[in-house]
Amino acid sequence: MSKVIGIDLGTTNSCVAVYERGESKVIPNKEGKNTTPSVVAFTDKGEVLVGDSAKRQAVTNPEKTIYSIKRIMGLMINEDAAKEAKNRLPYHITERNGACAIEIAGKIYTPQEISAKVLMKLKEDAEAFLGESVVDAVITVPAYFNDAQRKATKEAGTIAGLNVLRIINEPTSAALAYGLDKKDSEKIVVYDLGGGTFDVTVLETGDNVVEVLATGGNAFLGGDDFDNKLIDFLANEFKDETGIDLKNDVMALQRLKEAAENAKKELSSANETEINLPFITADASGPKHLVKKLTRAKFEGMIDSLVAETITKINEVVSDAGLKKDEIKEIVMVGGSTRVPLVQEEVKKAFNKDLNKSVNPDEVVAIGAAIQGAVIKGDVKDVLLLDVTPLSLGIETLGGVMTKIIEKGTTIPTKKEQVFSTAEDNQSAVTINVLQGEREFSRDNKSLGNFNLEGIPPAPRGMPQIEVTFDIDANGILTVSAKDKATGKAQEIKITGSSGLSEEEINNMVKDAELHKEEDKKRKEAVDARNAADSLAHQVEKSLSELGEKVAAADKENIQKALDDLRETLKNQNASKEEIESKMKALSEVSHKLAENMYKKDEPNTANDKKKKDDDVIDAEVE
């Protein structure tokens, strides 16, 4: 069995790790960095850029640069979080089968396809580092991700050509990395605040067991929201001063986003920073510049309500675990946004305890995922990971009520059955509406999908017995079945529609990704050939210039023709590697002939020079 990689597919950055020779370690990308920006860009030339190269050109290409795609993963277009994302993000969010999608240059991409491009880069970087093909992976998700979001993440892995062995919760993964070597049992809290999501999880670790006691969070709260508070502040101040709304200018908005992100990072170590954006926009009076000094205190005032929300969630989750705060031994901080001083201060204050910063917040989740991969593969023995479902699952019953079948906090994998009946006399079919959430009424919870059980024999209401079974696998993904106990007729639904993609669509996307992989390879080869051709043409032109009149007219004409042919081919942006190399070969051949001719011309002169020098030598006799 080949190596299993662990992937932290983050909102802002992603990380990949592998377990080998008894330890889990982060795999650097081809740029030499341990994390890769979760950014994908489409250029006007048809190139697809991923990671640092995509992030670098975001300001000049805002509408075709996709970031924070995780925030709309598995979302339906009519959900509030989707509406918020449409208002915030510069690229065009549309829908496909009712689920969120992205439109770029007239083509629709799902969040799964965009995320797959990030995963493909991580896969390729891992293969380059390990020197072997990689297929199997463990991918992490926020603990509070619902079924649709988990399913969409797994689909992204499939599209990227990965065999996703397990979907694992990020805080659980971090605890696995942190607690694997702990012999004594201890209760810990993992506070995970990333770019777009927040989770807090209470776990018990020790003696190679990692057990989740309770988990909670917000799948739409993270460092992006800190940035957005600062973006709003800067845009509003600028509008008050100039009357210009920068939010209507996608390029200005992208510059604001970069400036806000940098200011946030600087204020983690400095008490004041200056945001300086020259030529941010212009009006009839001329160009406008944005220059603003910002103190840490001012920034903390903007985000204090968001941080307070995370502290409230801490209290809820510790209570759900049946514990008091003084029973918590360690608070492990995970996610890049935990570097914000206010976050650290408030979490420390909440527990009245120093925080554990021994783990790298950007890397620990991937490291834990790699350990889980090694457990599945059998390289790590006797490790037991007991995770839980973050939200209750049930069905809609009479009166629009949600009847829970699996309560939140239930250890997974799990399987539970419950018997229901008909609501009307002679009812021949029942509709099973599968729900996820904690509210009393079905309309206030998320519908994951529905299906019909038909062919129920006529009977008074309340008589037929319909057995509904909920089965959650180790990935937290749900299968629901219903069976009429009298006839044995059954119907099953694997909750797939909630992610917006059918199995056929996923298979098509896998093929499409493979096709584009080959296209990208050819495009890269053409770029390399183009660079080599430019270099050759420059060298030949330089040689012609230096040799001047020494070059015979016929040779010069042949070389110039080959040069012109090559230059003409290079003007065609779609020229293939083979076309370019053919013209390069022709130029190389005539250039070599020139070199041979020049060498032959020089040979007699060299011999005469040598003879002349010999004639000038006076023989000396030595006694």
From Swiss-Prot:
Residues 595-615 have a biased composition (Basic and acidic residues). This is Chaperone protein DnaK. Keywords: ATP-binding, Chaperone, Nucleotide-binding, Phosphoprotein, Stress response. Acts as a chaperone. Belongs to the heat shock protein 70 family. Induction: By stress conditions e.g. heat shock. Pfam families: HSP70. It comes from the Bacteria. It comes from Campylobacter jejuni (strain RM1221). One of its GO terms (biological process) is response to heat. The modification Phosphothreonine is found at residue 197.
